[in-house]
């Protein structure tokens, strides 16, 4: 199996349970892209080896696969000559990442994040196209369905309120009960509303992206959960949020973490009141630092 994300790890276990002999899981990166518990439950528990910093450099066979050649890669991901290993096998599974399906979004003119390949959204999960909201794996790839359900509830609530606002309707039937109250969500916002400045969230260091990508302070809930992923494993670190620049005097919030890894989504909770303490706020910088 090439690829050690959660799908690759789970497929290693499933193939084993179905009677196949999984010889090895190879991963191009120097770390697994899956949850730690999946490495333990899907590989370690079944004595399936995981080779990090390895990739497939050759596939053997004509009518069907008869074997593959693995090689170690350097820090740039290029195969290192002389490190080749041959494995006799009849199947090669490729689990090399997920890309959100966003053809419809492109047709609508929705702006996409080049890192996630998903829409750029604000605190209401609304895109740059008014009335178009995004959540779940079409927005960014999730670890757990619980997070998808939470986002879906929030996006649905905001979309319903947007419709009510647009129709100037007071029909309460469309606004179903939700864990997000009126005070939490506020009115559905538009990222292109010139009367309400947009505060962008800037990812620096090993932080690859954030969801949301921007917020409107006037429409932000009392507490806003910002989710993000990192690009490498960092131990004994802190997630820092800054106002405008990375300066200790401008640090809004910090959150200690024993370790962060690309395979596990991180989050930090931002309070509206703590942001309002910075009247000169023009952008929020989110970074992860060791120590």
Where are these regions (language model features)?
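Ferredoxin-type iron-sulfur electron-transfer modules and their immediate structural context
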Residues: 59, 98-100, 126, 179, ...
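FAD-site-proximal beta/loop scaffold in flavoenzymes
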Residues: 90-142
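Glycine-rich Rossmann-fold phosphate-binding loop(s) that bind the pyrophosphate
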Residues: 3-4
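A short alpha-helix-loop-beta-strand transition element characteristic
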Residues: 21-22, 111-114, 167
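A Rossmann-like FAD-binding core segment of flavoenzymes
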Residues: 9, 14-103, 222-258
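General structural feature for long, well-ordered alpha-helical segments within catalytic domains
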Residues: 7, 11, 21, 35-39, ...
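Rossmann-like nucleotide/phosphate-binding core characteristic of flavoprotein oxidoreductases
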Residues: 161-291
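A conserved FAD-binding loop/helix module that cradles the flavin
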Residues: 135-163
